[in-house]
Amino acid sequence: MASNKRPRSILVACSLTLLLFFATFASNGCEGDDAPWVLSLQPYFTDSDLEWDPELVGTWLSDDSSLKMTFTEGEKRAYKLLVVESDSGDQKSGQFEAHLLRLGSDWFLDLFPTGQLPSTEFIEMHLLRAHSTARLELHQNSIQLSFLSGAWLKKQLKQQIVDLPYQETQGMLLLTGTTEDVQRFIYFHADDGAFSDEARLFRQEDQE
């Protein structure tokens, strides 16, 4: 059963990693203030891993309307994803490229930001785009996204239970290994509590 806790900001977790200005993105998190974001320099997929499911296309909305995700068809078995987050009347949106893949018996999404932030060329020099991932459960009228838990991963790394190249900086765990490294990690630890930052969304009918 999905957790009732509101997930931390997906736009923060998945969007441009601001190595220069990261501290400006304050967010109330279900894992606590000390839980780092988890991002990967390399994608979680290779071209041969990619799958396509037309049932994912459409608009999905959380129970409290704080999170809306709209998937449309992209190129080369990719989805275009628009994420809109609402909080006390304040609305923010971000654009992503999403890829669907299967590792073991589970489905996952790789999310990569494609939208532009208003900035100067100098500022853009200091921004890093990185990948995030979530385990996906796709049902007829709902989806559940379980994002990689930074609190869980940080604990496993410190206890040397997980062996994965990474750097910790600015409240973030930046995975620096290869695609093979991060896939192996997911394959062996997906059911160990690694994916516990959950969001459930419900399909919205097309409005004529």
Where are these regions (language model features)?
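N-terminal secretory signal peptides that target proteins for export/translocation
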Residues: 1-8
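Bacterial N-terminal signal peptides
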Residues: 14-25
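Calycin-type beta-barrel ligand-binding domains and close structural analogs
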Residues: 30-55, 63-208
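Short hydrophobic transmembrane-like helices used for membrane targeting/insertion
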Residues: 10-12
